[in-house]
């Protein structure tokens, strides 16, 4: 997950300090060199864009990862996350205001607790699949739609897919590996968030734009839970 070295982080901070009013960007090349390239975005104070020639030259040298900076936003932006979800390269963003780095490496396993949110790579469903993989249960990839689409009233992918992987737990005797289907948004009637039990009263989940964590399955979460499923492989015969 954290793929930058201390020296590489320091170099990125130095590049960022030279341009405090706009986003800077660049690559980490094979061998560890950190380079800055021109941000050709028409709105460099809020976005970054790398020109094709710079990308080509870096590709010839061998790209290990992509980095850029944010002036105020602490973390990957929605646009960053959409692009990252379709990319195989590690990404990093440095926030000048907070002084924090956020890193995402889709090629490396991430810890279940404390992973950063990155839609399509580190999100609520990928956390569920990773936890269940530890239990020997392989789940298919569910469609997520576009970033933020889970807040729309007609968002149904999770509900459409859920009963294909397990059956409802009706007696509230929950166990490790049971999947929670929840609605946390403004539009009831559909699932917009999922989690997974780690024991009969605590569950693991990854809220949008926050780090993954474990919460107690108290009254508030019970009200937000639409259904609990037990994967087929975990039902005792």
Region spans (language model):
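Glycine- and charge-enriched low-complexity intrinsically disordered segments
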Residues: 215-237
